[in-house]
Every structure is written in structure tokens, then in C-alpha cells.
A protein has these predicted regions:
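Conserved SAM-binding strand-loop segment of SAM-dependent methyltransferases
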Residues: 86-99
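A short acidic, Gly/Pro-enriched loop at the edge of an enzyme's catalytic core
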Residues: 98-109
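Conserved SAM-binding loop of SAM-dependent methyltransferases across substrates and taxa
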Residues: 53-64
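S-adenosyl-L-methionine-dependent methyltransferase catalytic module, highlighting the catalytic core
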Residues: 3-28, 55, 72-79, 83, ...
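A short beta-strand submotif of the Rossmann-like class I SAM-dependent methyltransferase core
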Residues: 112-115
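Conserved alpha-helix/loop element of class I SAM-dependent methyltransferases that forms part
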Residues: 24-43
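Conserved SAM-binding motif I beta-strand of class I
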Residues: 66-71
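Conserved class I S-adenosyl-L-methionine
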Residues: 43-52
Length: 249
């Protein structure tokens, strides 16, 4: 698990321009949406489901009076407890969102970023999040898109003999994603609606071009950014890496 923490911390400072851009873009989008959610739903209580390395917890603690970080992994909870030492309004708790013991209708905002792809019953998890929100509360959600080339490459990378080459190219932590439930945008919208949410805003980001990302540096990144601008909102937007939602309970 310490390897996973190391990986998550490396993503935002990666030596590889594309890897760094993909994750920083997602972080910026989530942070922007959290600020909007706090301004809309109020600055009372927030929950982050699956905080991982805790990249969003400091901002949540700035925006909200009381922040709960729930996870099932002790390493991530230990990391959150360290953060709580400097953020007294942060409370880490061991909780499984698929069988949550948190009080119903007790949060103004729930953040769930890059989590539901690890959960087989993602709609059940979304229903649980809906139940934790006060009426009119907001969910900030992100999850990878099923047909993203990056997700396909992530599976290919761990075929026998390939992962050694990939690690040699990146010279950084490379671990299997653990993504067992990738959704298309229509599927994600259906699950959100089925859980009782109304989508207020949505979007996508992130182009990954195999080999271009690994071997052409900043020149390749500029090409990926150019392609991304032309894909957003178009017929090929399902190939972008991450989908984002701001939804009301």
C-alpha cells in the first residue's frame, strides 16, 4: 500500500509531461468544482469517499467547516490522520461506501474522485452517497471513461513482459490500476439518475496517445492538448480519459 501512496503522489510531479498534465488537469477541474459546490451548497459538512493520498483534503478543509475522509484502506486513513494533525476540522473514518455506517442526510457535499471504477456495484455506491447528502446537497464525481486509450494502455502495460519495459521508460512507480468497472458517459448518467441525482454540470478531459506520450515529450503534449480541445463536446469525447459530474441530490 505504501507503493500506491507513492504512486499517487508521483502522478502530479511526474517526469513525463503527458502523465503530469493529465493528472494536474483533473485535479484543477475537481478543485474548481469543489469551490463551486461550496458556494452553492454551503460550507457546512463535506465527505470525501476514498481520499487516497489526500490531494483534495487540504482544500476541503479550507472550504468546509467539518470534513470527513472515509476509506477502507488503512494506509490511506493513516495518511489522512497525519493531515488531521494540521487540519483540526478533518476527521478520518474507516467506512465502506457500499455498506456505509455514516449518518444519513448529514453532508452538504460529497466528493468521490476516481473511486467508483474500483467498485463492482457503482450504482449502489452512488445510492449510498445520495443517502448521505442532505436534500439539495451536491455530489462531485469523477471516473475514467471506458473507451479511453489510456485505460486500454493501462491493461496492455501489465501483459507479461511489457510492464518491465514500461517501468524502464517512465522510471517512476507503475502499478496496475485496479479498475474493474469502467463506465461510458451514458452509463454514468443512467447510474446517477437511478441513484436519485440530477446532473447540473458535466465534462471530460484528457487525451493520451500511446508512444507519443512516452517518447515525444513536450512536443507530443502540445499535440495531445490540441486534439483534446477539438474532442471536448464532440462525437469522439468518449475517448477522453476522465468524465466529471456535479449532481444534486
Amino acid at each position: 500500500m505504501s507503493e500506491l501512496l507513492s504512486l499517487q503522489e508521483t502522478l502530479y510531479t511526474s517526469r513525463n509531461p503527458t502523465r503530469r498534465w493529465l493528472h494536474r488537469t483533473r485535479r484543477a477541474r475537481i478543485e474548481e468544482t469543489l469551490r463551486l459546490a461550496a458556494a452553492t451548497a454551503g460550507s457546512g459538512r463535506a465527505l470525501e469517499v476514498g481520499p487516497g493520498s489526500g490531494v483534495y483534503l487540504p482544500l476541503l478543509c479550507q472550504l468546509f467547516d467539518d470534513v470527513v475522509a472515509s476509506d477502507v484502506e488503512e494506509a490511506f486513513l493513516a495518511n489522512a490522520r497525519e493531515l488531521a494533525g494540521t487540519h483540526p476540522n478533518l476527521r478520518p473514518v474507516a467506512d465502506d461506501i457500499t455498506a456505509s455506517g455514516l449518518p444519513a442526510q448529514s453532508f452538504d457535499v460529497v466528493l468521490c474522485s476516481e473511486v467508483i471504477e474500483h467498485i463492482e456495484d457503482s450504482e449502489g455506491a452512488l445510492r449510498a452517497m445520495h443517502g448521505l447528502l442532505r436534500p439539495g446537497g451536491l455530489l462531485v464525481l469523477s471516473t475514467p471513461q471506458r473507451h479511453s486509450p489510456l485505460e486500454l494502455a493501462g491493461r496492455i502495460a501489465f501483459l507479461p513482459g511489457i510492464v518491465t519495459f514500461v517501468r524502464a521508460v517512465y522510471r517512476e512507480p507503475i502499478l496496475a490500476t485496479g479498475h474493474i468497472n469502467l463506465l461510458t458517459a451514458p452509463e454514468a448518467r443512467r447510474q446517477l439518475a437511478g441513484a436519485g441525482f440530477d446532473v447540473l454540470e458535466s465534462g471530460q478531459s484528457g487525451v493520451y496517445l500511446p508512444l507519443v506520450a512516452e517518447f515525444t515529450g513536450r512536443i507530443g503534449l502540445k499535440l495531445e492538448q490540441w486534439i483534446e480541445r477539438r474532442m471536448i463536446g464532440g462525437r469522439l469525447s468518449g475517448l477522453l480519459w476522465v468524465q466529471y459530474y456535479l449532481a444534486r441530490a
